[in-house]
A protein has these predicted regions:
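Active-site cores of enzymes that catalyze phosphoryl transfer or operate on phosphate-rich substrates
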Residues: 191, 291-295, 411
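Conserved active-site neighborhood of enzyme catalytic/cofactor-binding cores
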Residues: 1-30, 125, 138-150, 217, ...
Length: 490
């Protein structure tokens, strides 16, 4: 914790105390969020180890020990602040009871066909080795090179500008704007991609910006999400140029094994030496990076579990408009996020310290088996509860190793504290809750995902009011963060 977090909780306490003074019967639970990537990174750094090189059970124990120490410090600060919450019954998001509820909600949504398994291009954080959702991405202006490259035509050349020349091997088309008269006669003809030498077609497409670079754009798998959309629309065959280790694959030929930045430097050198470069510009580029690792993300086809959300956007907009925001302007953060949703939510992660996805697969026919809800399951560690596969009768299973996105846990906190699926009378009395106090930087994650999940499971919004706090700032006006070293200890 730092002083900003302490101030945040002190203000939450003021809300609770004011309600009591107005004669209300206040339910003020306190929870400790103990899942996710931060504790894994903390544990790796503290012990000088790597998660994937450590036995899973041992790594989980080390994470739990670290969390126990951090939690004790956090609770002490809360008590010293004089918070009036219920310390005798505070909950942890990594408890068996909490994780069992997360798994139970997954099983219910699976049976309702709200969750599915699919292989799609996903945001991939190669530093942490897992898929991440759009909500876990931020954009930073980073320096890079805009390389104007010569693609050979039958009678000449076309200049194409790109910040990702390392993906030339994955180029499957070149697009130009149909209104760009410079390329009218070239639409439908072929060009040869430099270095990798494959022939691709020049196609007309409205997304090509006439004013950017030369106006001609290479379409590769995958430089950005526009490439993803174009590959689907134009029915192009993808080339997996970057692997899960964050390095170029064999598809890159002589550049295989290099990290993208290394490959970019080497390919630019080779392009220049072979006469394929018209010019190079030093630019500042709006780059998508992982919110956690701050590494530029790659887009890699991976099999993941998805929770349907595209079809719920208008419903979320309706519910969001019914929630009273304090201050009112922060309601727009939610609305802007709803406007940006284009894909379903990838909810599976390739990490260790999180709630496990409760599925076993038949070793013979691969049929998934989901157990009865109510218990906490660890498929990577425990035997399948089923004696035989319900589809083929085979008796051997293999457990799912992936965990949930931590927001799958956090998003059901209103359900857990109101004893959803546990005490129907208490649930009816306390749900929906009155107010959600939280920081504004997680409106598009915690607030939105809670709204989505709770509506999916109950048909109701989880609260009627949202109190949104800003950031604790240092003397320079920068957001306080322990990682930046500018935070004050409360």
């Amino acid at each position: 914790w730092h002083i900003g977090a302490a101030a945040h909780y002190a203000q939450i306490d003021m809300i609770a105390r004011t309600a009591r003074m107005n004669g209300k019967n206040v339910y003020f639970p306190i929870g400790i969020d103990r899942n996710g990537l931060p504790v894994e990174l903390y544990t790796e750094k503290k012990h000088g180890i790597r998660m994937r090189e450590t036995e899973r059970g041992k790594f989980l124990d080390l994470c739990k020990d670290a969390l126990d120490d951090l939690e004790a410090e956090m609770i002490l600060i809360m008590k010293n602040l004089g918070l009036s919450c219920d310390f005798d019954n505070y909950y942890r998001t990594d408890s068996k009871e909490y994780r069992a509820l997360t798994q139970a909600t997954f099983i219910e949504l699976w049976k309702n066909d709200s969750i599915y398994l699919a292989t799609r291009p996903n945001n991939y954080d190669w530093v942490t080795g897992t898929t991440i959702a759009d909500a876990e991405i931020i954009y930073e202006e980073l320096p890079t090179k805009l390389v104007h490259m010569k693609f050979k035509t039958k009678d000449g050349e076309v200049i194409i500008a790109s910040t990702r020349p390392e993906l030339l091997c994955a180029c499957k088309a070149v697009i130009v704007n149909p209104k760009d008269v410079r390329y009218t006669d070239l639409i439908g003809t072929k060009v040869t991609v430099p270095i990798s030498n494959q022939e691709v077609e020049i196609q007309a497409h409205h997304s090509a910006q006439i004013e950017f670079g030369s106006g001609a754009v290479m379409v590769c798998s995958y430089g950005d999400h526009n490439d993803v959309a174009l590959f689907r629309e134009l029915d192009l065959e993808e080339v997996i140029a970057i692997g899960q280790d964050g390095r170029l694959t064999e598809a890159a030929g002589a550049y295989a094994g290099l990290k993208p930045k290394q490959a970019r430097t080497k390919i630019i050198e080779d392009l220049e030496s072979k006469g394929f470069v018209e010019k190079i510009e030093e630019i500042s580029h709006r780059t998508p990076v992982s919110e956690r690792s701050r590494a530029p993300i790659e887009i890699i086809p991976m099999e993941e579990f998805y929770l349907k959300q595209k079809g719920s956007v208008e419903k979320m907009r309706e519910l969001g408009s019914q929630i009273k925001f304090y201050p009112k302007m922060h309601q727009q953060i939610l609305m802007n996020w709803l406007d940006s949703i284009k894909i379903d939510w990838p909810i599976s992660r390739r990490r260790y310290y999180g709630t496990e996805i409760p599925i076993w697969y038949c070793k013979k026919c691969s049929e998934p088996y989901l157990p009865e809800p109510g218990e906490y399951y660890q498929p990577w560690y425990l035997e399948c509860p089923a004696e035989k596969c319900p589809k083929c009768g085979f008796t051997e299973f293999v457990g799912e190793e992936r965990t949930f996105d931590t927001w799958m846990d956090s998003s059901i906190s209103p359900l857990f504290i109101t004893k959803f699926k546990k005490d129907e009378e208490f649930f009816k009395r306390t749900y929906p809750t009155a107010v959600r106090p939280q920081a504004k930087d997680i409106v598009r994650t915690w607030l939105y995902y809670t709204l989505l999940r709770c509506e999916n499971l109950t048909g109701k919004k989880p609260w009627s009011e949202a109190w949104i706090m800003g950031y604790g700032l240092d003397e320079k006006g920068m957001k306080m963060s322990k990682s930046k070293g500018n935070a004050l200890d409360p």
